[in-house]
Design a protein with these regions (language model features):
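PRPP-associated nucleotide enzymes
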Residues: 1-202
Length: 202
């Protein structure tokens, strides 16, 4: 599916942590530049897996206004969640990007995550990339919830997703035979290994 972009001027952007493991494989296979688009979901205090919005690398914040009333969070709790996530994004930017500038986003962007549940992490990333000048965004994800994917698909030029699921209960991890969360050290190591491999291939 993504073979059309092999050795093109497209840039693979991974949303860490989990998206990088997927993106490394795709970038190697297609012989493309790999970089990061750091986005993190905003979670309620009692559940670090469920998100009610996300914060992107440029400070873009998006909230799931339909979900928020059902969570019964106070305005203070919502703002605390946003602030905590903004700090997480800043930390990841410093650790994983350092002083390295973003790549030229005028190139076609293949945006990759490990899956799509509510879609707010990807929607926030797409919005940030648009603000930064991206004109062509291609979404590539291994698995997604159908309704959420339909909402996100309207915001990109193309979608590649081999495993689309329906139902009221959806978890990205369920689509994988082996699943575990990557920590920031592992993400940094994966990116460093890819960079070394790419430099040797030049």
């Amino acid at each position: 599916m993504l073979g059309l972009h092999r050795e093109s001027d497209a840039i693979v952007l991974a949303i860490p942590a989990g998206g990088l493991a997927v993106a490394v494989v795709i970038a190697k296979e297609l012989n493309l530049t790999l970089d990061l688009a750091i986005v993190s979901k905003i979670t309620p205090p009692w559940n670090t897996e469920a998100g009610y919005g996300a914060v992107a690398f440029d400070g873009t914040v998006m909230l799931n206004e339909e979900l928020l009333p059902r969570l019964h969070l106070t305005s203070k709790e919502i703002q605390q969640g946003i602030s905590k996530t903004e700090e997480k994004v800043r930390r990841r930017m410093k650790k994983l990007r350092g002083d390295r500038p973003m790549p030229d986003l005028q190139h076609p962007i293949i945006l990759i995550d490990d899956g799509l549940a509510s879609g707010f992490t990807l929607r926030t990333g797409i919005e940030a990339l648009r603000k930064a000048g991206s004109r062509q965004i291609i979404l590539a994800i291994p698995t997604a919830h159908k309704e959420s994917l339909q909402a996100v698909a309207e915001k990109v030029h193309a979608v590649y997703c081999p495993n689309i699921r329906r139902g009221s209960v959806f978890a990205v991890a369920d689509a994988y035979e082996h699943w575990r969360d990557l920590d920031e050290e592992e993400v940094a190591g994966l990116l460093e290994d890819f960079t070394k491999m790419a430099s040797k291939a030049v």
